[in-house]
Design a protein with these regions (language model features):
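Non-ligating segments of multi-cofactor redox enzymes
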Residues: 1-311
């Protein structure tokens, strides 16, 4: 490269105007990625009823990864917001897709999706989103994001649900009851009555057997480790998250850490429980604490197994 005044890097160029951008001052999720001062970030709804000012101090700042994709909701708002009727939810697997032939670029779906997971393609004039790798799903393969994840953090599985209960669950008056209401929508694949009805409705036995072996059912229903992202949106999201364990936040007196028996107290974790509850259970701390305690107990047990050779 010839000598110049700048480092040989690719400077940002606007896809809208085509001009070079000297300084990027705002972008998607700008506040969430620490792109601005804390005064703006603290407006995040997840900080409701959290002593937010404490986390504005650098030494108390916490980070967590939240890999988000389309939630493929049971009650998708994007479907209802599209004037062209281009968005639909497939009956056979629940995947939400955009018909590119029907899409007219109204962009109502972008503002209609509370998870911000629909994007407008300025070149094609169409809206686009995660398609859950449906061609791979149809051929029995996992999604690309699941297969290529080095940490193996993603789990896929069949989950049976009662479609007749969706409206009732989404209409639950108290936001904190929405998580439990969605659990009631899911069906036990080992229940003989569920199996009988599923076969009558044309569900193949192979799908029922897959549901019985589904890791998703175990994480969400049996162990109750996975929780829905912002259930207060009432979309009944179908991509759930296991809350993250975080380093222990030292108590006021240096060297003292809250303990609950043999495992650390979940209230001593660096990421506030209330913050996670606002994100995953509409502010209800009980399911979050239960999941964190189970994760801490399993970590403690596994540590003793591998290090102390106990059990």
């Amino acid at each position: 490269a010839p000598l110049g005044d700048h480092q040989p890097i690719a400077r940002p160029r606007s896809l809208i105007t085509g001009k070079r951008m000297q300084k990027i001052e705002w972008g998607p999720n700008w506040e969430e990625i620490l792109g601005s001062e804390f005064a703006k970030r603290r407006a995040d709804k997840n900080f409701d009823q959290v002593q937010a000012d404490i986390y504005g101090e650098y030494e108390n700042t916490f980070m967590m990864y939240l890999p988000r994709l389309c939630e493929h909701c049971l009650n998708p708002t994007c479907v209802a917001s599209c004037p062209s009727g281009a968005i639909y939810k497939r009956e056979e697997d629940g995947i939400v897709l955009i018909d590119q032939d029907k899409c007219r670029g109204w962009r109502m779906c972008i503002s209609g999706c509370p998870y911000k997971k629909i994007y407008y393609n300025w070149k094609s004039g169409k809206s686009e989103k995660c398609i859950f790798c449906y061609p791979r799903i149809e051929s029995g393969q996992p999604t690309i994001c699941s297969e290529t994840c080095v940490g193996r953090i993603r789990y896929l599985g069949v989950l049976l649900y009662d479609a007749d209960k969706i409206k009732e669950a989404a209409s639950t008056p108290n936001e904190k009851d929405l998580y439990k209401a969605q659990l009631d929508v899911f069906l036990d694949p080992n229940d003989p009555a569920v199996i009988e009805q599923a076969l009558k409705d044309g569900v193949p036995m192979s799908v029922i057997e897959a549901a019985q072996k589904s890791p998703v059912y175990k994480l969400a229903m049996d162990w109750q480790l996975a929780l829905p992202l912002h259930p207060e949106y009432r979309t009944l999201p179908m991509v759930w998250y296991v809350p993250p364990l975080s380093p222990i936040q030292n108590a006021a007196e240096a060297g003292k850490v809250g303990m609950d028996g043999l495992i650390p107290d979940v209230d001593s974790l660096r990421i506030p429980v209330k913050y996670l509850a606002n994100m995953l259970t509409a502010g209800d701390e009980v399911p979050v604490k239960l999941a964190l305690k189970r994760l801490l107990a399993m970590r403690s047990y596994t540590l003793r197994q591998r290090v102390d050779k106990v059990g």
